[in-house]
Swiss-Prot record:
Residues 174-176 are annotated as: G5. The gene is tuf. NCBIfam families: EF-Tu, PRK00049.1, PRK12735.1, PRK12736.1, small_GTP. Belongs to the TRAFAC class translation factor GTPase superfamily. Classic translation factor GTPase family. EF-Tu/EF-1A subfamily. One of its GO terms (cellular component) is cytosol. Residues 136-139 are annotated as: G4. This is Elongation factor Tu. The keyword Magnesium applies. The lineage of its organism: Bacteria, Bacillati, Cyanobacteriota, Cyanophyceae, Synechococcales. InterPro entries: EF-Tu_GTP-bd, EF-Tu_GTPase, EFTu-like_2, EFTU_2, G_TR_CS, P-loop_NTPase, Small_GTP-bd, T_Tr_GTP-bd_dom. CDD domains: EF_Tu, EFTU_II, EFTU_III. Residues 60-64 are annotated as: G2.
Length: 399
């Protein structure tokens, strides 16, 4: 029991390993657990445990993801590793595994490859705030100058995607030798984790952000007024506070006259709570599913945005045929479907494409028929007749 209590005293951070196939992401993940297990800060996970990750479904998309957990002296980590490249793309776009930071694994024997670049771009697009580089397989390169060249190449690559390439720590490691118990390489894993502790910022707790709750349901209580229910996404709301109702119709203000959870009255509701909020002077018809209740002035509704989208394959339940610019699906945003149009799209690197095939990964411009509270970094699904055909993340608000 003592262990449980100990764990909660440390801040919790979500991280993951990213990088090119066969550069050693999974081996490095196993090495971290092996080295930390010797200090009692992790359970040993071997390569096969992590590589045989079960399939998970997120927004109707099948993703293979392995989750391991471990501690350092100052933090508790949840660490995600994906076996396949397609799994990373899906994972990062759907936000199935939200990352507060990532360890970019690059083999010193190869240097940066196609997926190294793609994962850095994805990390930038979906808002992974910080990276640390693990230069892996350094035991296989005798020439120190060669290692320095690879490091320079990685730093330039990071800078080209607007990460601070000159400042990001690059640690020389060998996942395999660390697992085999060679002391000098075990020490390098400690050095890597110290870099992660120091360079991946602690996430702002949801409860410290401005209040937001997406409306799931609305009903009237005779003699008391209108109640909106939903799960508080972030922040805190107190009885007597003013809020704004944003999206679909014109923004309007109201005052919260009651907060109720499990039929009990509360003084306040906080991030993660499923609550009913009693709103003063609001009729049932003024408010509907898909609107959000927010701290006044903290969010404005928008109709045009850019997004990074993964389009499901036919085997994943997606479309069987391609679509073209002007395609009009529904965008499922927070709690509701909003009709919109995909007005333009390019491939990942901004190259022109005529049409979008099932299984593609694109950048797109979307326009909604009514303004909704969308924000940069927010996830959405693209649906057609109630079934998901794509998943995306908002990369930029246009208007």
């Amino acid at each position: 029991m003592a262990r449980e209590k100990f764990e909660r005293n440390k801040p919790h951070v979500n991280i993951g390993t990213i990088g090119h196939v066969d550069h050693g992401k999974t081996t490095l993940t196993a090495a971290i657990t092996n080295v930390l297990a010797k200090k009692g800060q992790a359970q040993v996970q071997n390569y096969a445990d992590i590589d045989g990750a079960p399939e998970e479904r997120e927004r109707g998309i099948t993703i293979n993801t392995a989750h391991v957990e471990y501690e350092t002296d100052t933090r508790h980590y949840a660490h995600v590793d994906c076996p396949g490249h397609a799994d990373y793309v899906k994972n990062m776009i759907t936000g199935a595994a939200q990352m507060d930071g990532a360890i970019l694994v690059c083999a010193a024997t190869d240097g940066p490859m196609a997926q190294t670049k793609e994962h850095i771009l994805l990390a930038k697009q979906v808002g992974v705030p910080a990276l640390v580089v693990a230069l892996n397989k350094c035991d296989m390169v005798d020439d120190e100058e060669l290692i320095e060249l690879v490091e320079m190449e990685i730093r330039e690559l990071l800078s080209s995607y607007d990460f601070p390439g000159d400042d990001i720590p690059v640690v020389q490691v060998s996942g395999l030798k660390a697992i085999e118990g060679e002391a000098e390489w075990e020490a390098k894993i400690d050095e890597l984790m110290a870099a992660v502790d120091a360079n991946i910022p602690e996430p702002v707790r949801e409860v410290d952000k401005p209040f937001l709750m997406a409306v799931e349901d609305v009903f009237s209580i005779t003699g008391r007024g209108t109640v909106a229910t939903g799960r508080i996404e972030r922040g805190i709301v107190k009885v007597g506070e003013e809020i704004e109702i944003v999206g679909i119709k014109d923004t309007r203000k109201s005052t919260v006259t009651g907060v109720e959870m499990f039929r009990k009255l509360l003084d306040e509701g906080m991030a993660g709570d499923n609550v009913g909020l009693l709103l003063r002077g609001i009729q049932k018809e003024d408010i509907e599913r898909g609107m959000v209740l927010v701290k006044p002035g903290s969010i404005t509704p928008h109709t045009k945005f850019e997004g990074e989208v993964y389009v499901l394959k036919k085997e994943e339940g997606g479309r069987h045929t391609p679509f073209f610019a002007g395609y009009r699906p529904q965008f499922y945003i927070r709690t509701t479907d909003v009709t919109g149009q995909i007005t333009a799209f390019t491939d990942r690197d901004g190259g022109n494409v005529e049409m979008v095939m099932p299984g593609d990964n694109i950048k797109m411009t979307g326009e909604l028929i009514c303004p909704v509270a969308i924000e940069q970094g927010m996830r959405f699904a693209i649906r057609e007749g109630g079934r998901t055909i794509g998943a995306g993340v908002v990369t930029k608000i246009i208007e």
